[in-house]
Amino acid sequence: MPEVEVGILSPAEVSFRCHGLEFARARLSAKPGNFRSAPEIVFGAAPSERVLDGGNFAHFERLIRSIGEVRHAEGPGESRWWRLHPERWLESLVVKNICALDDQLDPRWCYSQVPAFSASDRAMIDVLVSNREGRLAVVELKADEDIHLPLQAVDYWSRVASHHARGEFQKFGYFAGRELSPQNRS
């Protein structure tokens, strides 16, 4: 597989993706009956995930090979691996080259799948990025037409403005060392 994206999900879990399609995760897992954890690899696409062991290593190799053979721009559109999660594929391309959308966006401060809360509701922003002046930009990606996009954009922007006004992005490790513009604050 030529291009593997590695994403940190938590201090104990790392994701492996091909053009946005997660095919494996490495994690520390608690062992039953004690407080110790042990590393394990989980592979497959939900809901068909399984823990890697000696009995299914060949299946893991076949999965990686088959995804790598079809998940690229010229791949066969009828393949399930090619069609799966088109918005994640688009997101992976945008994050790799955020300046293709706008040359004022700063690739050093580009984050994907950023949680945004409002009361008890949790949403995931596809891409949150700072421009060169420190102003925040929300990028919401759609693989298909969506009549709700304008309302979703307003909702996400209000969430981002609220988090920014309270300094929560830096508090949770986003934009570390980057001074964000106060113009974003409501």
Predicted regions and their residues:
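Charged, terminal alpha-helix-loop-beta segments
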Residues: 1-186
